[in-house]
Amino acid sequence: MSAGPAKNPSVVTRFAPSPTGFLHIGGARTALFNWLFARHNGGQFQLRIEDTDRVRSTKEAIDAIIDGMRWLGLDWDGDITYQFERAPRHTEVAEELLKAGKAYKCFATAEELEAMRAEQRAKKQPQRYDGRWRDRDPSEAPAGAPYVVRLKAEQEGETTLHDLVQGDVTVKNAELDDMILLRSDGTPTYMLAVVVDDHDMGVNHVIRGDDHLNNTFRQLGIIRAMNWDAPQYAHIPLIHGADGAKLSKRHGALGVEAYRDDFGYLPEAICNYLLRLGWGHGDDEIITREQAIEWFDLTSVGRSPSRFDFKKLENINGHYIREADDQRLTDLVKPRVEKTLEQGLSSTEQALLLQAMPFLKPRAKNLNELAENSLFLFEKRPLKLEEKAAKQLENTSGSLLAILRKTLGDLPAWDSESLEKALHDVAEQADLKMGKVAQPLRAALTGRTVSPGIFDVMILLGQDESLARLDDQLSLSPTHS
């Protein structure tokens, strides 16, 4: 294993989702990058729930985010920070800035601000607050008039951000207006809360999507006004769909619970795939968690958006299914099988599923396929045939099935060697290639055209069940007398 980049144990990162929805796949990648950077350095990874939007934030979404993080194996250090609970501290910082003359009260009414924006639109000017209360005395406002608190942003010069992914990015300070810190009802804004929380939590590396890049320059204004040390920033490109458009639900911008529950992916496959979306280590596609922790750094994160590719995710998931422990897969597949069968599996059937797992998993790319491919073991006779399997049997003479039934029925031993010899004998007797014998037999025994190897199928079903299923098809075959 190649040596990873140098380590810095003082690193503190954070993942700060808003609980207005589930943990979507883009957020999961952001969490993963923060977690890996902290774990690589032997530092701290913290979780903050940004629940200041009291209308849209829900307990269900908070629970889903925490559940998603745990499922992905992204453990955090210390207690979860809930942003809403820290509102008094955010207000305290705004009051400090007011006292220091680095923030001011703005009494502009909604009507005045709308007229200002309309004039800016008419003149084709950028729409931003014009600072009309920046240098006015609050005594000029009507008594008891509502106000917001705004940051007195720097107006001269420019700000350069040394971004760990994007490189140097420079913005003229005149392009940044005096943003609101406290609303007219006294509640702190998101922009203020984020800066205060990052500072108080000791966060010194902010790794987030590049859609936050513009916010960073505004947040740096608060940091400078408070004379705080700024964290290092790394703005990672967003994930796009396969067509190059911004990732949406039709591309796969869903919550991680959909990938787990609906699509049947394993968490290690999701993490491996998300890691490779925007970060690379040579030509390595399959990267274990241990390797990811050892190798991860921000210098290998690309600047271009990555494209979400379900096919690649399926292939990676197939790899992890093949590598997974049989008992673990059995436990994961069991509820899916029971849901389809609309009944629970007995202890004997569960043991059969476990016994079948080594033969089932090489052909499955997700847990749904694994469950689907195992159903033949538990379906009641006579089997419902898939359309392709029914056609296969329609095109097979009843005499071939009869020869198979007799040959298999006469076998004294029911093992791979005996079964293989028996099928070869039937193929020779009927002057057919092995596949022409195995395919209709598979259809008769499983009701499908895809299954584990035919000898594995017969051993799993056992002699009695295999012969009974053949008898069912023989009784339906018009060419069998």
Curated annotation (Swiss-Prot):
GO biological process, one term: glutamyl-tRNA aminoacylation
Enzyme Commission code(s) on record: 6.1.1.17
SUPFAM superfamilies: An anticodon-binding domain of class I aminoacyl-tRNA synthetases, Nucleotidylyl transferase
Record's compositionally biased regions (Basic and acidic residues): 118-139
Disulphide-bridged cysteine pairs: none
Catalytic activity, reaction form: tRNA(Glu) + L-glutamate + ATP = L-glutamyl-tRNA(Glu) + AMP + diphosphate
Family of this protein: Belongs to the class-I aminoacyl-tRNA synthetase family. Glutamate--tRNA ligase type 1 subfamily.
Function, as annotated: Catalyzes the attachment of glutamate to tRNA(Glu) in a two-step reaction: glutamate is first activated by ATP to form Glu-AMP and then transferred to the acceptor end of tRNA(Glu).
Protein name per its UniProtKB record: Glutamate--tRNA ligase 2
